[in-house]
Regions:
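Outer-membrane beta-barrel porins/channels
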Residues: 1-414
Length: 414
């Protein structure tokens, strides 16, 4: 993957032409110093240059020194065929592993206003301030076992920090045309974020093909960690709801949400889109209109005691071709792995008890199933006069995450 990204960096998708990263512009092989830091700064001008640069610096890939006409980069891991005095053309790792640790939070502070018109029309407006933080660290390895019982290996690690602050607004109206019926519509605006990403990557290899220097390592600049400031406009959505009251004991509700990921936007800290057409085209091609349906019901067993149940179905915001791995994905900096959302289903049950007209307690249990496909690296696809070509293929790892959460709420109504 890294060799292909280095060989075909800077691909012009319109003309079908590309150029690779010149070897003399790669970070110094096996050297970690201020000079290599400066080289990484230059690599920022290339598509995927940092990842390929780290792979070269740590000895994972290299140029073919025996053939000056070969302008491509190749994997440094291959087994020597003693009988034919040549390298085996296909050398694949015997053991591969990826460990990913993630944490984060989204905190939202709401300022709301809600007038009531004749107890028939209810209007709500909210201005929200959102703080976001995300932390990711990952470690990837490949082990190569050879017929002489020797073993080569590579290790690849990354750390990514994402921080952001944004604002948004929400508007909603609920109409009660009859005592037993509620109709609602709401609009949730995009969140306009100011974001900062900081990142660091390292890699090391052990390769007996180079017995004079089998252990090589490299890392991206670390003092301070490189960072990128940018702006992000997220998706907005519309919400439509209907609720019916059955006598004095039951209520049933249905909500439908329509998100709009097609008009998300990335820009620099000043709001300029340096690759406006490319960003717009990729977002339009990869993302669509996800749907969320919610169904809920509540039954009062006694005037004080109620039982609740609900379900939530959410489709992926990614278009079918994208989430099935048909397109190349461009991860951040030296991070090669990523996941593609395939939808969420959740079910909930709850109990509610009102001790007094003002004091109440709720107990809820939510079961959630989230599906996604994980990739250790993306396909590498180029386009020329003969059409699209996949230089590197990548297989998905299907993941299914099941969680159960229990929440106890105590409330007092003033």
């Amino acid at each position: 993957y890294a060799a292909a990204k280095a060989s075909y960096a800077g691909t012009d998708r319109n003309s079908g032409e590309w150029f690779g990263i010149p070897e003399n512009e790669m970070p110094p092989f096996g050297v970690v110093n201020n000079e290599s830091d400066l080289v990484y700064d230059k690599l920022g001008a290339y598509n995927g240059g940092w990842l390929s640069g780290l792979a070269y610096q740590s000895g994972m890939i290299g140029a073919n020194q025996a053939n000056v006409n070969d302008t491509y980069y190749h994997s440094a891991f291959a087994e020597w065929d003693q009988n034919n005095q040549n390298w085996y053309s296909d050398s694949r790792p015997d053991d591969v592993g990826l460990d990913v640790s993630e944490s984060g939070a989204i905190d939202q502070y709401d300022f709301s206003f809600a007038p009531n018109i004749s107890n028939r029309v209810f209007i709500g407006a909210t201005i929200a301030v959102t703080d976001l933080n995300y932390r990711m660290s990952s470690s990837y390895f490949e082990n190569y076992l050879y017929t002489d019982n020797s073993m080569d290996y590579l290790d690849w690690g990354n750390t990514l920090r994402v921080d952001g602050t944004g604002y948004s607004f929400n508007l909603g109206v609920i109409v009660r045309p009859a005592d037993y019926l509620r109709l609602g519509v709401a609009y949730n605006s995009p969140i306009w974020y100011k974001m900062t990403d900081s990142y660091w990557g390292y890699a090391d290899t052990h390769n007996e093909n180079y017995p004079e220097d089998p252990d090589v390592s490299g890392e991206t600049p670390a003092s301070p960690y490189p960072y990128t400031n940018y702006k992000l406009r997220t998706a907005d959505k519309w919400i439509f709801s209907v609720a019916g009251i059955i006598g004095q004991t039951a209520l049933i509700s249905l909500d439908y949400e329509l998100g709009n990921y097609k008009y998300m936007k990335l820009s620099d800290p000043y709001g300029y889109e340096h690759y406006e057409a490319l960003n717009h085209d990729l977002i339009q091609k990869d993302f669509g209109l996800p749907h969320t349906s919610k169904l809920g019901a509540e039954v009062k067993i006694t005037p004080q005691f109620a039982v609740r149940a609900g379900a939530n179905w959410r489709t992926s915001p990614m278009k079918k071709e994208f989430r099935e791995g048909a397109f190349e994905v461009f991860p951040a900096v030296t991070v090669a792995h990523y996941t593609l959302d395939k939808g969420t289903i959740s079910y909930s049950v709850g109990l509610g008890y009102r001790f007094t007209p003002n004091f109440y307690m709720d107990l809820a249990c939510v079961y959630r199933q989230y599906k996604e496909d994980a990739y250790t690296f993306s396909k590498v696809i180029i386009e020329d006069n003969n059409g699209l070509h996949a230089l590197v293929d990548s297989e998905a790892i299907g993941l299914k995450t099941n969680t159960t959460q229990v929440a106890l709420t105590l409330g007092y109504k003033f």
